[in-house]
UniProtKB/Swiss-Prot annotation:
InterPro entries: Daa-tRNA_deacyls_DTD, DTD-like_sf. It catalyses: glycyl-tRNA(Ala) + H2O = tRNA(Ala) + glycine + H(+); a D-aminoacyl-tRNA + H2O = a tRNA + a D-alpha-amino acid + H(+). The lineage of its organism: Bacteria, Bacillati, Bacillota, Clostridia, Lachnospirales. It comes from Lachnoclostridium phytofermentans (strain ATCC 700394 / DSM 18823 / ISDg) (Clostridium phytofermentans). This is D-aminoacyl-tRNA deacylase. Coiled coil: none annotated. The gene is dtd.
Amino acid sequence: MKLVIQRVKEANVAVDEKVIGKISKGYVILLGIGKEDTKETADFYINKLLKLRIFEDEQGKTNLSLEDVSGELLVISQFTLYADASKGNRPSFINAAAPKEAEELYDYFVMKCKESGTTVETGSFGADMKVSLVNDGPFTIVLDESIKK
């Protein structure tokens, strides 16, 4: 699983020029699901995501979590995070999960985030989406297998 987490002041996602998800202060999550990922993998990243302290406190230190600031999530599926361009110039996506399995884990990820009490908006799995956001910082973090070592 790979997550690109962008701290935002606001964001939205549109399909066919219609906004289908919109948040104020929070995170835009670009979520890539690999072929080896499981619900346990998702649980690990959800726990890490919801506890990340990357919002500033009164002293300007990144000490506050999404919950601390009543932040929201906009979760966007993005299999292209599994692009492998090591051979040639056209990326391969062989390490991305198959669409059916990826959608099931994506839905699970979103459901578990909602169960935490966090407001969650989403894109449309597999659709061509336009994501607009106002970065806050910018502050962007990538979570992937390397954090488990």
